Amino acid sequence: MITYVFPGQGSQKQGMGSGLFDEFKELTDQADEILGYSIKRLCLENPYSNLNKTQFTQPALYVVNALSYLKKIRDEEVKPDFVAGHSLGEYNALFAAEAFDFETGLQLVRKRGELMSLISNGGMAAVMGLNEEQVAKALKEYHLHDVDIANVNAPYQIVISGKKDEIEKAASLFETMTEVTMVLPLNVSGAFHSRYMNKAKEEFEEFLHAFYFSPPSIPVISNVYAKPYTYEFMKQTLADQINHSVKWTDSISYLMKKGHMEFEEVGPGNVLTGLIHRIKKDAEAMPR
């Protein structure tokens, strides 16, 4: 069995999608029309460093991931058994599963990016060396009540999210802990997957009412629940994803329990491939 995984914010880089925009000219033109700017120029030239601003990052990654997927299935003539995406990448997983078309997905991520960009002064940091329980305990002990766990990327790679000054304070405290191997501030423009996204979630929920989705043709593993999407709760799950933790470790563990599973990352970079390698390694090391 094979699962295709789609990356989210943090995987963007100048030059991504090179070659794809000309190959899929019709969809590229469609994207330009929806966005009101050239997606090719944004990805290849990165004017005003816009690629690192969430309102641009999200549509850019969605388009590049989608075109990468279309090229892959056209060239290889194979469809995956399962799909999953990290945060923004989940929209590409739903697109691959034919829950909505390219255009609908782009309209959704454009709105998602716009709403998330309105909430400023946030930050995120990855804490390496501690598991989710240990990070939660440390946040409590250090009275960092305004910091949330945003992503469980691997058993010992936990991302925290909150106001910029609180994240800086948290990072300094985590660095003093002997078990912590590294604290890495993330190059993001907001406190994603935290309570600070509640307003964005509410507005996005309203926006979703206008759209029609189809039942997924391939199981899509949800970040929020680490199990397949159900059609009835699709819109609710997408809205919840904005202010809930990304359960990436649990999602990959769920897929690994299905039997012999191969994973292929579709889109720019290999961040998810590295995380999956870590999850597998830690699963092997854990006592049964």
UniProtKB/Swiss-Prot annotation:
It is an enzyme of class 2 (transferase). It is found in: Cytoplasm. GO terms for cellular component: cytosol. One of its GO terms (molecular function) is [acyl-carrier-protein] S-malonyltransferase activity. Gene3D superfamilies: Malonyl-CoA ACP transacylase, ACP-binding, Malonyl-Coenzyme A Acyl Carrier Protein, domain 2. Its EC number is 2.3.1.39. It catalyses: holo-[ACP] + malonyl-CoA = malonyl-[ACP] + CoA. One of its GO terms (biological process) is antibiotic biosynthetic process. Transmembrane segments: none annotated. Pathway: Antibiotic biosynthesis; bacillaene biosynthesis. The keyword Acyltransferase applies. Keywords: Acyltransferase, Antibiotic biosynthesis, Cytoplasm, Transferase. The active site is at S87, H193. Involved in some intermediate steps for the synthesis of the antibiotic polyketide bacillaene which is involved in secondary metabolism. It catalyzes the transfer of the malonyl-CoA group to the acyl-carrier-protein AcpK (Mal-AcpK). NCBIfam families: fabD. PANTHER family: MALONYL-COA-ACYL CARRIER PROTEIN TRANSACYLASE, MITOCHONDRIAL. Belongs to the FabD family. This is Polyketide biosynthesis malonyl CoA-acyl carrier protein transacylase PksC. It comes from Bacillus subtilis (strain 168). The gene is pksC.
